[in-house]
C-alpha cells in the first residue's frame, strides 16, 4: 500500500498503472488526488501504508513536526517513506520565522513565497524526533551519472529515507 501526498505529475501515471500497487494519492486541493485532507490530522487509521511519498510538502505546513508524526502514525511497522524538502546545506539548523508573512520576504528567506521554513542539516534529526529512523542516500555517489531531470532529482540533493 502506497500513499503519495501531493503527487507529482511525472510519477502519478507511472504509479497509478502499476497493478502490484495499492496506490492512493492525497492532497488538500489537487483534482488528481484520491483523498483530500490536511496533513496535520490525517483522517486514516494507524499503520496503514507500507510506503509514503511526501515530497516538497513539509516546508509549506504550519506545524511540520505534527505532520511528521501523522506520517509516522499512518505508516506500517517496517514501512518507509521519502519526504524530500528544500535544504540549505550551509545551515546547521532549520530556519523559520513566523513573523515573515510577506511573499517577497518569504522568497528571500525561505527560497519560495509560500514556504514557511528553510530546512538545514538538522532535517534528519527532525524526522527522528517524530519517531522515524533515517537513512541518507546520495544519488550521485550511489547512481553516478543519471538523467536527474527525468527523475525529478536535484543532483546536489540528498535523499532521506524515513523508516518505521
Question: What is the role of each PLM region?
Answer:
Residues 56-60:
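Short catalytic micro-motifs in class I SAM-dependent methyltransferases
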Residues 62-71, 76, 80-164:
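S-adenosyl-L-methionine-dependent methyltransferase catalytic module, highlighting the catalytic core
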Residues 1-41:
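Class I SAM-dependent methyltransferase SAM/SAH-binding core
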Residues 5, 52-53:
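Hydrophobic beta-strand segment of the Class I
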Residues 53-55, 66:
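PRPP/pyrophosphate-binding module of the type I phosphoribosyltransferase fold
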Residues 39-52:
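A short acidic, Gly/Pro-enriched loop at the edge of an enzyme's catalytic core
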Residues 1, 19, 45-47, 77, ...:
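Residue-level preference for short coil/turn positions at secondary-structure junctions
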Residues 32, 43-46, 61-62:
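Activation segment
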